[in-house]
């Protein structure tokens, strides 16, 4: 199955998701534009509503009620994809990652939910800030889009 997310906002781009079967990892590829230099939190959020500056997307997708964590942590939200690194606003930020927790199949599917790129670095739940265990203290929302099925 394949899915696409058209990211819009201060940051924009296209992100593609591909998963061959429910028990296989999801390949995440694409690009983002206009990202300030540095690391930016990158998460699937619970709702496919991208209005109000992406705030209507809700919290990180967390159907299993876990603490926030790194993509490779034993405990994490389903939507915790870590960080993307940008070389600066004039550079294209290429996205190439794989994730074993998100899925395009079944009741925990990310289809119809939103993808959000944040203003700040995700501390992966390891920081001292009170928001570390829920959002990774990753700040505001630079861009977002709805994850939808695309043609093969």
Curated annotation (Swiss-Prot):
Belongs to the Cu-Zn superoxide dismutase family. One of its GO terms (molecular function) is superoxide dismutase activity. PANTHER family: SUPEROXIDE DISMUTASE CU-ZN -RELATED. The lineage of its organism: Viruses, Viruses incertae sedis, Naldaviricetes, Lefavirales, Baculoviridae. Zn(2+) binds at residues 60, 68, 77, 80. Binds 1 copper ion per subunit. Its cofactor is Cu cation; Zn(2+). Pfam families: Sod_Cu (PF00080). The keyword Oxidoreductase applies. Cu cation binds at residues 43, 45, 60, 118. Disulfide bonds join 54-144. Signal peptide: none annotated. This is Putative superoxide dismutase [Cu-Zn]. Destroys radicals which are normally produced within the cells and which are toxic to biological systems.
């Amino acid at each position: 199955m394949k899915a696409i997310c058209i990211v819009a906002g201060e940051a924009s781009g296209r992100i593609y998701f591909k998963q061959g079967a429910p028990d296989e990892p999801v390949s995440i590829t694409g690009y983002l534009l206009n990202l300030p230099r540095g690391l930016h939190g990158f998460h699937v959020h619970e709702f496919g509503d991208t209005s109000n500056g992406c705030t209507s997307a809700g919290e990180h997708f967390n159907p299993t009620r876990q603490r926030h964590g790194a993509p490779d942590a034993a405990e994490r939200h389903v939507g915790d994809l870590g960080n993307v690194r940008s070389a600066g606003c004039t550079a294209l930020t290429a996205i190439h990652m794989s994730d074993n927790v998100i899925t395009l199949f079944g009741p925990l599917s990310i289809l119809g939910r939103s993808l959000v790129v944040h203003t700040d670095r995700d501390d992966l739940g390891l920081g001292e800030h009170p928001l570390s265990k829920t959002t990774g203290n990753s700040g505001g929302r630079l861009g977002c889009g709805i994850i939808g099925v695309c043609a093969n």
